[in-house]
Regions:
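An N-terminal assembly and electron-transfer interface module characteristic of large anaerobic redox
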Residues: 1-266
Length: 266
């Protein structure tokens, strides 16, 4: 898929830079949003990213050291801390400095999540009853990378449309485990939870960014229309051949059709 191709480009870009370490983790799974969820896996490409990269790029002959840990977020705090200490040892760090760094990292990450929800609540509170916004449904490496998503949120803003990331929504309050007990993709859980939030709020509509060849999305996208409550949404597949003109044409057409849909709703 396109993000994996981009990751190869990022690594190639590092080859000529004066770096000491290249952090290239194998992330197997993520934290659970609910105790009722059995697993929260990353996609197979994310899990095996360092091995895919090594099959295409000679990293052993480089001057820098590759840090290639296997990360299991769902195994709990103590297991994760053990992983992090091992990474630190490979980078030449030990003792109190490492423990302080782990503590600060967790606090900073938690603070960031809280800021996202606070900012999201603030944005939605200011959105009028007859206003609307597009929620960017995506994985973070699509929705948060302006190079990968062709700066789509900013382009929507130029069209006078507010675009917000799905992480602005309080997704942890949505329990999809009853209807999808075997939804073991972490972002599948988040995407379907976001769809339910959108379905309940008449001001929100979805713009789903995916990639050609995305295995998990080929399944998740089949359930999305049902969970979004039958509301119109736009799905855009992006790869290295995508261009501004085609994307903008689809967005403009969707916004035009949305006007008619909203007239019927109101």
């Amino acid at each position: 898929c396109f993000p994996i191709k981009v990751s190869h480009g990022h690594v190639v870009d590092m080859l000529d830079k004066d770096i000491d370490y290249l952090f290239l983790p194998s992330v197997i799974n993520m934290t659970h949003a609910s105790s009722k969820v059995t697993h929260s896996y990353a996609c197979p490409y994310v899990q095996c990213l360092p091995y895919i990269i090594r099959s295409a790029i000679d990293l052993d002959s480089q001057k820098f050291k590759v840090l290639q840990p296997i990360i299991h977020f769902e195994y709990g705090e103590s297991f994760l801390d053990k992983n992090l200490r091992q990474i630190a040892r490979e980078a030449g760090c030990r003792g109190r400095r490492v423990e302080t760094a782990i503590k600060m990292a967790k606090e900073t990450q938690e603070s960031f999540y809280e800021q996202l929800e606070t900012r999201g609540k603030d944005v939605l509170d200011k959105l009028g009853e007859e206003d609307f916004a597009l929620v960017i449904i995506s994985r973070p490496y699509n929705g948060c990378d302006s190079g990968v998503n062709l700066d789509l949120p900013e382009k929507l803003r130029d069209l006078g449309v507010l675009a917000i990331p799905m992480d602005f929504l309080t997704l942890d309050l949505e329990d999809i485990s009853k209807d999808y007990p075997n939804m073991y993709w972490k972002y599948g859980q988040k995407i379907l939870a976001a769809a339910r939030v959108i379905a309940r709020d008449k001001r929100l509509y979805a713009l789903y960014i995916t990639n050609f060849g995305c295995g998990p999305d080929s399944f998740i996208s089949k359930f999305f229309p049902k969970e979004v409550g039958g509301k119109p949404f736009l799905m855009i597949d992006i790869d290295e051949h995508s261009a501004d003109a085609g994307i903008m044409t689809r967005c403009e057409a969707f916004l035009d059709s949305l006007k008619n849909a909203r007239i019927k709703e109101f």
